[in-house]
Amino acid sequence: MSIKSDKWIRRMAAEYNMIEPFEPNQIKQRNGESIVSYGTSSYGYDIRCSDEFKLFTNLNSTIVDPKRFDSNSFVDVKGDICIIPPNSFALARTVEYFRIPRNVLTICLGKSTYARCGIIVNVTPFEPEWEGYVTLEFSNTTPLPAKIYANEGVAQVIFFESDEVCETSYKDRNGKYQFQQGVTLPKI
């Protein structure tokens, strides 16, 4: 299994629509202003979050249960930024839509710009033949409110190509998060 380079990522995006929309370069500025970078990097792709957020709230004072998750635990927020309260979290989705090849697995890691501010981005691996928008989780580990910027870089996807094709892909298993279109809450 080997990590894939910028050249491979560009080729897969062009020939197989692996990432849409796709940015072949690293974008660091918009309208002359510095932003959190996104686009193709040396050995990965820096993804952006859209302007659709689900902000966790404790208004209902319920127990957080992944098997019986109460969707009322979130408030929908749409905008260029999302302010996450102290010691809380928010969900978002990527701007980019992914189509992962059958012989590829990805790992997604938060960008250091956010990590150095106490904001942790968590995403599980994109499995072989998974397709959809990625649901992102932002945890604010600080005692202060934290700001997330929509349409800027939030995490880096690293692509690994296997030496052999898996017997059963995410698509073959009818994975519950296949083809997700928006911010997707826990499913059992």
From Swiss-Prot:
| Role | Catalyzes the deamination of dCTP to dUTP.
Q: Which organism is it from?
A: Nitrosomonas europaea (strain ATCC 19718 / CIP 103999 / KCTC 2705 / NBRC 14298)
Oligomeric and partner information:
Homotrimer.
Which Enzyme Commission number(s) are listed? 3.5.4.13
Question: Which amino acid positions bind dCTP, per UniProt?
Answer: 111-116, 135-137, 156, 170, 180
- State the active site: 137 (proton donor/acceptor)
Q: Which UniProt keywords apply?
A: Hydrolase, Nucleotide metabolism, Nucleotide-binding
Recorded GO molecular functions are: dCTP deaminase activity; nucleotide binding
Residue spans crossing the bilayer: none
Q: In which pathway does it act?
A: Pyrimidine metabolism; dUMP biosynthesis; dUMP from dCTP (dUTP route): step 1/2
Q: Name one GO biological process term.
A: nucleobase-containing small molecule interconversion
| PANTHER family attached to this UniProt entry | DCTP DEAMINASE
Where does the record locate the signal sequence feature?
A: none
- List the InterPro entries: dCTP_deaminase, dUTPase-like_sf, dUTPase_trimeric
**What does it catalyze?**
dCTP + H2O + H(+) = dUTP + NH4(+)
Q: Which family does it belong to?
A: Belongs to the dCTP deaminase family.
Protein name according to UniProt: dCTP deaminase
